[in-house]
Amino acid sequence: MKSRVVVGLLLLVAACTGDGETGGGTDGPVGSDPGSTEATISGSPATAGESGDMTCWTAPPGGGESAISFSDQTEAMGLVTPLVGMYGHAAVWGDFTGDHRPDLFMGTFADREPSIYQVRGADGAAPDRLLLSAEGGFTLDDRLADMFARTSGGAVADLDNDGDLDLVVSRNFDDDMPAAPGVQVLRNDDGGLTATTESGLPVQLGGRSVGVLDFDLDGLLDLFVTSDDGGSVLLRNEGGLVFADATAAAGLPGDIFGLGVATGDVSGDGLQDIFVAGSNRLFVSNGPGSFTAADSSVFTWQFFGEEDLISGASIADVNRDGLLDIAVGHHFNSTVDEGASVPVRLYLNRGDNGFEDVTEAAGLVGLPTKGPHVELNDMDNDGWPDLVTTASAADGTRPAIFHHQGLNGDVPTFSAPEGLGNPQYWVAGPSADVDRDGRLDLFLVEFDPSLPSLLMRNETSSGHWLEVAVGPEHGFGIGWRVEVHEPGGALIGAREITVTQGYSAGVAPIAHFGLGELQEVDVRLVAPGGEPIDLPSVPADQHLRYPAGCP
């Protein structure tokens, strides 16, 4: 099934030298033909002495199981006791302390009867928590003021351009908890988070997931907050951590029902677009500051019950054509209540011909439980992004991950995980390389307070890898497009640096790529509305931050 969306691939025609300054030479267009993946990046490698050493850390490919596998490191990393008494819902990775390790914020629904929380040693409902990361594990940050609310989602971003990551949280506003606003920014002060006041953010919003983008290209990061009351909002950053509702002014309707959100340039004009999971509507940028609703009929789902909802979304290129594709997860109660089997869905970006639902052709079988959270990430670093879900496999003990097996024509094919059938699922499962071994780990958010949320260490046998980040002088690169190519040749992967993945979850602003057997790649960076920056001959197996590493 196809639906026409005006999608033209961005012609990346300007060349840059390896030190990030614009040069006089020119490269051929990258991705100008959606059917071609041949592209050449030329110039001098970016090395120490030119742009400075951009390498933050390195790690060789890891050994382990050939199948995607995990070990439970929750207790070993100190994440059991601090998270008791929680109806977990929101989880956000981000480096708040500036030590280049991912810290963890977890939000909870604290509005139930106290007795419900009194399990696993908890005295009652816990507030939202911030866990700070160190090499040996996590410690509870007691500087975070207690907040008891229905915290549903969140994301990190440098919202005041002071060089560190702030936190924005969204909540289902509850009249019984008037102190907890629907959207709130917590300013980062020396690694501690402090709630802002007089921010102009909506107080009574039924907030869910949070998207971050600079939709008007004014250098200030804006917010798109989904709402399950049909009033999702676009919030323009006015500076000074003050925001204004720009929904109508940007051409967006006021009735957008949403649970999840994904931002990314699917139209190829160099500007970020917005996909809202829930009502499954795509809004395409038609220039800085405004959007047009695209024909979104291809994203229509069949429902089996009143409590069936569409939840998370993820955007990345899954077939190496340079176009960003969309995966969508579900929160279908009919799977656990009525025995329905419902797949997460995959939509290929067909350029000017719109999107095509390739779920069945890709081998994405129905799930017997909810799969709210989805991510397109390469979990074994073989060069192909896998489809991560928070449905369970392995008899309910591991996340269900569909392993990318390569292309059938231009359609990706996935193998289903073993052990599907258990009703266990997790609300969210944001990824991060917690132990710096080049493999993405997962934090699985548990809604039931009688069970723990889980930190799952990736122990899969790994190919080569590369992580690309951008420094605070460029807003941590949120919205930047990152491409990796074989040296002088074909496209291996393309994605944008985003801080929103899946459902109710946030990730650090890092683009992760598996490289398979490649030990060196060419990298191309493009800021929204900007010119390409070429970094040829980049060694694999490193975390790289442009332009000056991790001081």
Give short role names for the model-derived ranges:
Residues 77, 81, 291, 410-551:
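Gly/Ser/Thr/Pro-enriched helix-cap/hinge segments flanking short amphipathic alpha-helices
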Residues 104-108, 167-171, 223-227, 274-278, ...:
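Hydrophobic beta-strand segments that make up the repeating blades of beta-propeller
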Residues 13-62:
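Ser/Thr-rich, Pro/Gly/Ala-heavy low-complexity intrinsically disordered linkers and tails
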Residues 56-73, 113-141, 177-196, 231-246, ...:
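Beta-propeller blade repeat segments, especially FG-GAP/WD-type strand-to-loop junctions
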Residues 94-97, 101, 134, 157-164, ...:
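Calcium-coordinating acidic loop motifs
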Residues 78-91, 144-155, 199-211, 251-262, ...:
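Repeat-based blade/solenoid architectures
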Residues 77-113:
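Beta-strand-rich domains and repeat architectures in extracellular enzymes and scaffolds
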